[in-house]
């Protein structure tokens, strides 16, 4: 009789890519704060600086934390599946709450200043991304954390969940880039083309946002870096194939 399976070692390059992604993500958050502090006066809720809460919260929530939530199944390869599910879900909750604060901040700022809402491409994309993110979390909770969902439903929905998770993350980064460009054009106008220090800093920030998204998506698309099936998952997978003659669920 075989003993318990030993933990699968992490692929050699995976820890380095994960560490690089975290370095990029933290740099993006720090540089966003530096941009707002150096050129936009900082952040505050009860003042004209309330708008600055918006970009910082969106970068922390819908870019950095969402990206980290997607990496949970690559980083925690040998922990119990339930534990990784809960961590994956909690990171999305934190991302949602922080993004919600950012969304409230921009609407409150517009209301106080008498500005129009939801007229730009950035705002349309932002509302779409926020709605998709919330819907994805609700459906994911219903299928993978709520005990009532059947194994067959989970296995059939999982590919869609994985795809839309990556797609929403990519759309979040694209929306952040749109917002960054919009903020620069509003503030700098024609001076943007004269290599103003703020414009250069923001351009570097945009490149780092794109780099963070690229590294995260690369980690997610490497099939050999997926979380290996644990013993109980393999047993459920075999039972499901026997009963339904369908495909066994792949790990995220």
UniProtKB/Swiss-Prot annotation:
Subcellular location: Cytoplasmic vesicle, Secretory vesicle, Chromaffin granule membrane
PTM-bearing positions, type N-acetylmethionine: 1
Reaction(s) catalysed by this chain's protein: monodehydro-L-ascorbate radical(out) + L-ascorbate(in) = monodehydro-L-ascorbate radical(in) + L-ascorbate(out)
Membrane topology: Multi-pass membrane protein
Entry-annotated residues carrying Phosphoserine: 248, 250
Cytochrome b561 domain sequence ranges: 20-221
Group of enzyme by EC: translocase
GO CC annotations, alphabetized: chromaffin granule membrane; lysosomal membrane
One GO MF term attached to the UniProt entry: transmembrane monodehydroascorbate reductase activity
Protein name: Transmembrane ascorbate-dependent reductase CYB561
The species this protein was found in: Ovis aries (Sheep)
Origin organism lineage: Eukaryota, Metazoa, Chordata, Craniata, Vertebrata
Gene: CYB561
